[in-house]
């Protein structure tokens, strides 16, 4: 089958042919329709330090997808041939304390599709049936293909009650921009997002941001004053991994505020702990998606009017994958879709 793989220890990916995956007793085989390019895939493309330490070579990658079940293992129940599915990209052990307690997103033995094992940038993907998630017919293939990052945004944004709250989001990548739409959808009052990328800040405005602030030109304090915010933000969502953005977020929080961290800052990042301690801030780390509560909430929000369509800005046939990666690398894109229909 055709697949997009890391064949050598260096930058780039190669469209090549690999063996079709075998289907285990508890697996489903998915014929891929659409995939989306993730920030993780950009790390793999660049072959940065993280990728060099993490990605086995050779291996085909990718973990954002939608497709159709074409084969099932003999032990699979609850699915049928022809079901349209996306899937949870974190494969968990099922036996550790967190898995057995229903907290699979905290499994210490997690294996990542397209990171630690063969991925979805291929004509076919085999995964445990447990990880597959049926997509309702009213949700498009394009939106279903981005359920993985949509889930990151949902898990982060819904970590705290947002109804009537003032929310600060630092980092206007696709996940941060989707978090804007989620926060507004569930009832936040002011949703302010910061970045230095005008293209993505404009996307955030289209997704409903109260203010989208280019911090290289505009003061967050001035924006807060314009919005008549006298006490600070109630909830902060850190999506950038940029130390200066995290510092600004902490300084802008109200006393008793709540902070969710999805962005990954450098390991030795220093912060002003006075901001945390004397303000009584609650800080929560976010990894992946809650299985499968996050997935059900994603569907419910889309079915109740959440519009994420502006976040999908580019579409390419898989044979033009280099154009797709170029769009992502340019910084002037939202989500980029690769179409496998003609593969």
UniProtKB/Swiss-Prot annotation:
Cofactor stoichiometry and binding remark: Binds 2 Zn(2+) ions per subunit.
PROSITE patterns: ADH_ZINC
GO cellular component: cytoplasm
Protein name in UniProt: L-threonine 3-dehydrogenase
Subunit structure as annotated in this protein's UniProt entry: Homotetramer.
Cell compartments where the protein resides: Cytoplasm
Cofactor dependency: Zn(2+)
Species in which this protein is naturally found: Burkholderia thailandensis (strain ATCC 700388 / DSM 13276 / CCUG 48851 / CIP 106301 / E264)
Entry keyword Metal-binding: yes
Residue numbers binding NAD(+): 175, 195, 200, 262-264, 286-287
Name of the coding gene: tdh
